[in-house]
A protein has these predicted regions:
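Short helix-coil-helix linker/hinge
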Residues: 10-19, 116-124, 129, 133-137
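A broad "ordered helical/assembly scaffold" signature
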Residues: 48-51, 109-122, 132, 153-154
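Single-residue recognition of alpha-helix capping/boundary positions
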Residues: 16, 43, 111, 120-123, ...
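Winged helix-turn-helix DNA-binding recognition segment
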Residues: 26-87, 135-194
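Cysteine-centered metal-binding/redox modules
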Residues: 22
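Positively charged, structured surface patches that bind polyanionic biopolymers
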Residues: 1-17, 28-38, 54, 89-118
Length: 198
């Protein structure tokens, strides 16, 4: 089973994770590093077609692909050699500074396929958030709220539609066997969710 090392950053509101995960799925092996971190392309049209081939419906236009390749927010995920038409993913966590090792989320083929099939970049961001904080905890759990996730990620924690979406995501992730949720009361008597990655 192949694992994918996704650089993690909470401030993900402007990140199109459908685009990012598609690049990870397309990556070929770099013979020097033995990592799946290399995407070669002939033209922007060719690259856009490759990215869109991972979805039932197109998620990008050629203009959007061009813009994303130039956009600073995606620098954390890859570097682009426009002369040789090669994208190199920044997924070599072993070469990162020790303080940055935990800035990765590791997902497998099953998780990648599920997240891409969701066609929902907010769901992807939410799952990576849970996985990041659970995956590197000795107890493999996180005690959090929808508002905490939204606030950390740059969304409005007061927006009712986002709160409702997170509730839906909890059910979807739980029903599909990715998380387990245990409800508990805090010291003030407020109900909170305790999340476990399965």
């Amino acid at each position: 089973m192949r694992n994918y090392y996704i650089p993690y950053d909470e401030k993900c509101k402007k990140v199109n994770y459908l685009y990012v995960l598609s690049l990870y799925k397309l990556a070929e092996v770099d013979k020097k590093t033995y990592l799946y971190n290399r995407i070669s392309y002939d033209t922007i049209k060719d690259l856009t077609a490759k990215i869109n081939s991972n979805y039932k419906e197109s998620i990008l236009s050629e203009a959007t692909t061009t813009r994303y390749l130039q956009k600073d927010i995606y620098n954390r995920f890859y570097s682009v050699d426009t002369d040789n038409k090669v994208i190199t993913l920044k997924n070599n966590f072993q070469k990162q500074n020790i303080d940055r090792i935990n800035k990765f989320v590791i997902i497998n083929d099953k998780e990648l396929s599920f997240l891409m099939a969701s066609n929902d970049t907010l769901l992807i961001a939410y799952y990576l958030y849970l996985k990041y904080y659970c995956g590197y905890s000795s107890s493999n759990k996180i005690d959090t709220t929808a508002k905490q996730f939204l606030e950390a990620s740059g969304y409005s924690p007061k927006a009712g539609n986002y709160i409702s979406k997170i509730s839906d995501y909890n059910k979807i992730l739980n029903d599909n066997g990715f998380i387990k949720i245990i409800k508990k009361r805090d010291n003030n008597g407020n109900e909170r969710n305790e999340y476990y990655i399965l």
